[in-house]
Amino acid sequence: MNIQIQPMGEYQTNCYIATVDGKDFIIDPGVGATSWVLSNTTNPIAILNTHGHFDHIWSNDELSKKLNIPIYCPKDDCFMLENDPLKKGAPKSFADFKVEHDEKIILENVEIIFHYFAGHTPGCTAIQIEDNLFSGDFIFKGSIGRVDFPYSSPEAMKKSIHKVLSWESDFTIYPGHGSRTKLSQERISLKSWLNYI
């Protein structure tokens, strides 16, 4: 598996191209992502959104049309693609597939799991491909996603942290902002955040 990364826009939101067996999955195409994605993908299969915030989905519509590929988004965040609730001027897009909580999908023989971790947003997910976890704004290196936005939920975030702490397997985490880390390296940080939410 090959993973390309490019921070995008004012908030340096990480856009990823995850390539498995020659198949490209575009994860969180944010502000200005189109040119970079078009230059670095050869066999695009789908756009995968970890959640619906504008800086993660800004280029959804443009890329979907240019590449003729579908958009997969957690069902509870699809309204954000359509309505721009934070009023940032994000281009409207529509999910071709509204992903259920903890749903496993198979695309071109590649297994992808949308792990449900609400809190930062109602439908916030971490997308698993092999032993890699694209965590969006759920987990960062040494931190977690904010829970003071409209539609955020501190209580849901606590449940999500307890959920991920119950996992026995380790994963390489590719977050929505900042550098990669390992789940095993974030356990102490995650436990401490439970006291501050």
Residue ranges and their predicted role:
Residues 53, 77-78, 148, 179-181:
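Short histidine/acidic/glycine/proline-rich micro-motifs that form metal-
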Residues 1-43, 92-166, 182-184, 194:
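Catalytic core of the metallo-beta-lactamase
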Residues 169-197:
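Charged phosphate-binding loop/patch that engages nucleotide di/tri-phosphates or the phosphate backbone
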Residues 31-107, 188-192:
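Active-site HxH/HxHxD metal-binding segment of metal-dependent hydrolases
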Residues 27-29, 45-52, 71-74, 115-119, ...:
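Active-site neighborhood of phospho(di)ester-bond hydrolases with catalytic His/Asp-centered motifs
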Residues 5-7, 17, 47-52, 60, ...:
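Secondary-structure boundary/capping motif
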Residues 79, 126, 177:
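Divalent metal-binding pocket/active-site signature
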